[in-house]
From Swiss-Prot:
Belongs to the urocanase family. It catalyses: 4-imidazolone-5-propanoate = trans-urocanate + H2O. Keywords: Histidine metabolism, Lyase, NAD. Homodimer. Pathway: Amino-acid degradation; L-histidine degradation into L-glutamate; N-formimidoyl-L-glutamate from L-histidine: step 2/3. The lineage of its organism: Eukaryota, Viridiplantae, Streptophyta, Embryophyta, Tracheophyta. It comes from the Eukaryota. Its EC number is 4.2.1.49. The keyword Lyase applies. InterPro entries: Urocanase (IPR055351), Urocanase-like (IPR023637), Urocanase_C (IPR035401), Urocanase_central_sf (IPR038364), Urocanase_CS (IPR023636), Urocanase_N (IPR035400), Urocanase_Rossmann-like (IPR035085), Urocanase_sf (IPR036190). One of its GO terms (biological process) is L-histidine catabolic process to glutamate and formamide. It comes from Trifolium repens. PANTHER family: UROCANATE HYDRATASE (PTHR12216:SF4). The keyword Lyase applies. This is Urocanate hydratase.
Length: 564
């Protein structure tokens, strides 16, 4: 199908709600609803193009593939598995009831050819799509999906640099897309003010509409005045500043050097991983960018990469002023390094700076979705988690804040960070709630690919591993294989998410709590094994926190005694 025909059949997509099945059982129905939920206009960034988030992260290769995926799921039997290759349904095979109902591989290229240039050739020929992380694995839940991880990062930054108190402090960042859009709310929940630069006004308006952002500003002076007033009044607020980060950040550096306001933390979540589709070059307007991406993508890439170098240099300038500065995983430092900024890696990534100790205990982004479409199902599961983990005061605080501040996008969903020994208990509790009728329909449980054992990304999740194993990608492959063997409902293997082609490999997992005894067994296996692979991976790398965790949970790690 050509692009023109594909766009012609585009329509508004929303997942079915309620208890009526459109597929053979709830395991298949879950996939049927979740791919559609990914393209809900309240969820996706550009649903008319099948783009969910992250530049060009898509749910299906084209509209013909999307429609065929839905038809294939409706015809799928409980002992069959659908195979999806880069957003295209390519086969249905007989397996067994405990096998995944869908297996997905997105954007995977042989390493020598794992470049954006080669990917774009294949994409143009209709042979591949970019799945990002949760876009092509059908478990994106809107900006909430990254809020708590960003919140935990900002809280840890406050703990490390400001005695645990971000009151009166402000965070400077950029990017208000599907991932970056979480930053304003996360920062405010952590107690800080946030100034986020964004070049597309529609994205600022989207975050205002979904209550992730408090104010919009059209000039640096206006934005700084709002931030300054709030900081002095000890109020946490967020401002979206319409502008280009490669222009605004250098200006803020010059103002700071001249005695003006200085941020207290600096980071970035622009879509710098994709120089053609994700980053507006300095001096360009949106119309020129849009047309040039089609007519002269190489010129766009060249200009964008040069702008990223300027952007990173400004971040370095702040870093050298003593301001905590951190890369938030979009590979912008790598681009700047390639463009001649030799000290681009002088500031760290957020995982080694703040998050790795959590990974060592198998902690990561546990998310669930109410297939009923009823928000009350989520509120009931919130209460269940509080009862299940009464000692987790931070979890209780998060769930309270989430209920108060986070607007649902599409099917009601929740995310919280849980670790090894906790995720399976949550899954079993949800399954019991479905079984006894407390919930109106089954619950889908998944996670981001950004997790403790499911990703190899040397410039992000696995940056600066203590044993030097940053680029070893056996670990996410093992994670996917184990989750398949354990009985996950669908499993995905992707390449390039977050940081772009050639820089990451990662795996996703989704499992359904449908109230059956069979689901109890699958949930027990998958939601134990999945975080356990993260503990295993970090223990193998030499992290004592992970080794202690492995011992506490009696993991069988055959070489543990021989580890240095």
């Amino acid at each position: 199908m050509t692009d023109s025909v594909s766009k012609a059949v585009a329509r508004t997509i929303r997942a079915p709600h309620g208890s009526e099945l459109h597929c053979a059982n709830w395991l298949i129905e879950a996939a049927y609803r979740m791919i559609q939920n990914n393209l809900d206009p309240d969820v996706a960034e550009r649903p008319e193009d099948l783009v969910v988030y992250g530049g060009i992260g898509k749910a299906a290769r084209n509209w013909a593939c999307f429609e065929q995926i839905l038809r294939s799921l409706q015809a799928l039997q409980p002992e069959e598995t659908l195979l999806v290759q880069s957003g295209k349904p390519v086969g249905v095979f007989r397996t067994h009831a405990d096998a995944p109902r869908v297996l997905i591989a997105n954007s995977n290229l042989v390493p020598h050819w794992a470049t954006w240039d080669h990917f774009h050739e294949l994409d143009k020929a209709g042979l591949m799509m970019y799945g990002q992380m949760t876009a092509g694995s059908w478990i994106y839940i809107g900006a909430q999906g990254i809020v708590q991880g960003t919140f935990e990062t900002f809280v840890e930054a406050g703990r490390k640099h400001y005695n645990g108190d971000l009151t009166g402090k402000w965070i400077l960042t950029a990017g208000l897309g599907g991932m970056g859009g979480a930053q304003p709310l996360a920062g405010v929940l952590a107690g800080a003010c946030v100034l986020a630069v964004e070049c597309q006004e529609s994205r600022i308006d989207f975050r205002l509409r979904t209550r992730y952002l408090d104010h919009k500003a059209f000039s640096v002076d206006e934005a700084l005045a709002i931030i300054d007033k709030a900081c002095k009044e000890k109020r946490a607020i967020s401002v979206g500043l319409l502008g280009n980060a490669a222009e605004i950040l250098p200006e803020l550096v010059q103002r700071a050097k001249a005695g003006g306001m200085k941020p207290d933390i600096v980071t970035d979540q622009t879509s710098a991983h994709d120089p053609i589709n994700g980053y507006l070059p300095a001096g360009w307007d949106l119309a020129r960018w849009e047309s040039s991406r089609q007519s002269d993508p190489k010129a766009v890439e060249k200009a964008a990469r040069a702008s990223m170098a300027v952007h990173v240099q400004a971040m370095l300038d702040f870093c050298h002023m003593g301001i905590p500065t951190v890369d938030y995983g979009n590979n912008i430092r790598q681009v700047a390094l390639d463009e001649g900024v030799k000290n681009a890696f002088d500031f760290p990534g957020f995982v080694p700076a703040y998050i790795r100790p959590l990974f060592c205990e198998g902690k990561g982004p546990f998310r669930w979705v109410a297939l009923s479409g009823d928000p009350e199902d989520i509120y009931k599961t919130d209460a269940k988690l509080k009862a299940l983990f009464p000692e987790h005061t931070n979890l209780h605080r998060w769930l309270d804040m989430a209920q108060e501040r986070i607007a649902f996008q599409g099917l009601p969903a929740r995310i919280c960070w849980l670790g090894l020994g906790e995720r399976h208990l949550a899954g079993l509790a949800f399954n019991e709630m479905v079984r006894n009728g407390e919930l109106k329909a089954p619950v889908v449980i998944g996670r981001d690919h950004l997790d403790c054992g499911s990703v190899a990304s040397p410039n992000r999740e696995t940056e600066a591993m203590m044993d030097g194993s940053d680029a070893v990608s056996d670990w996410p492959l093992l994670n996917a294989l184990l989750n398949t063997a354990g009985g996950a409902t669908w499993v995905s293997l992707h390449h390039g998410g977050g940081v772009g082609m050639g820089f990451s490999q990662h795996a996703g997992v989704v499992i359904v709590a449908d109230g059956t005894a069979e689901a109890d067994a699958r949930l027990s296996r998958v939601l134990w094994n999945d975080p356990a692979t993260g503990v295993m991976r970090h223990a193998d790398a030499g992290y004592e926190v992970a080794r202690d965790c492995a011992r506490r949970h009696e993991l069988t790690l055959p070489m543990a005694k021989e580890l240095p």
